[in-house]
């Protein structure tokens, strides 16, 4: 018997990423935006299957896209993944632990976790503000990409991300991401153009507002993109094959191989497992 007691209750729900089954346009839009935090994305698949959904599109990281494809090849998972018709992934550098988000809120922003009502990692304007809405309605913001928030997350990189080279989701139907490393539209180039140069290329002012690179990797993905384009839901600027290849090579080669290469080599020397790519 004790006369006193205590318990610690931590509510992560206001800033923890989670899988969501969205069935309406508004629900999909509410889920939009980058989530720089790992979360069990595939848990939503079972929920979608239980709901009886017959045509399922899933958005996930490249590593989760690979898991989905493996499940789709295994008859034991037919009841869960049998109705997936589209796999959409993102260009991925890493997914930093929830502790990284907590560090941004408490140490970088100087706020209390228990006061948080919601967060956005990359609120407008582009390339993004780390935005924290408090329960009292106050909104606090700092530059996430250019203000140091993104770089601060590096020390919270999970081990599994340190030896991953899967950046542009080779097994997804469609891959979406920023235009970093594009020879014209990379965000670090956009403020360097003259008014004359901007007037000659209508993509540049649009890119300043935030432009998405779209990589189509399958016939199913192409049909989906073509339908969205025909309906006027999206506006696309087609790239010549050599330009697209140059962009994708830059995204891959200037990203994970440089950052993760030394880690992978060290693991090989130590006899530790690494991912094999063929």
Segment roles from a protein language model:
Residues 1-278:
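Iron-sulfur-associated redox domains of electron-transfer enzymes in respiratory
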């Amino acid at each position: 018997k004790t006369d006193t007691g205590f318990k610690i209750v931590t509510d992560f729900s206001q800033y923890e990423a989670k899988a969501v089954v969205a069935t309406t346009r508004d629900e999909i839009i509410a889920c939009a935006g980058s989530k720089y935090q790992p979360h069990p994305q595939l848990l939503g698949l079972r929920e979608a299957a239980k709901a009886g959904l017959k045509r399922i599109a899933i958005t996930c990281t490249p590593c989760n896209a690979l898991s989905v494809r493996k499940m789709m090849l295994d008859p034991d998972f037919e009841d869960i993944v049998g109705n997936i018709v589209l796999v959409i992934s993102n260009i991925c550098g890493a997914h930093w632990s929830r502790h990284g988000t907590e560090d941004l809120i408490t140490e970088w922003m100087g706020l209390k976790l228990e006061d948080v009502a919601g967060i956005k990692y990359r609120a407008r304007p582009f390339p993004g503000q780390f935005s924290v809405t408090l329960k009292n309605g106050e909104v606090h913001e700092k530059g996430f990409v250019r203000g140091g928030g993104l770089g601060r997350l590096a020390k919270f990189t999970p081990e599994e991300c340190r030896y991953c080279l899967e950046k542009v989701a080779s097994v997804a139907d469609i891959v979406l991401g920023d235009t970093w490393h594009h020879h014209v539209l990379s965000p670090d180039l956009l403020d360097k153009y003259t008014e004359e140069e901007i007037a000659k290329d209508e993509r540049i002012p649009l890119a300043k507002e935030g432009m998405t690179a779209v990589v189509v990797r399958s016939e199913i993905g192409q049909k989906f993109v073509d339908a969205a384009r025909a309906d006027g839901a999206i506006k696309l600027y087609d790239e010549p094959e050599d330009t697209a290849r140059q962009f994708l090579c830059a995204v891959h080669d200037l990203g994970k191989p440089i950052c993760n290469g030394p880690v992978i080599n060290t693991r090989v020397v130590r006899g530790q497992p690494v991912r094999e790519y063929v």
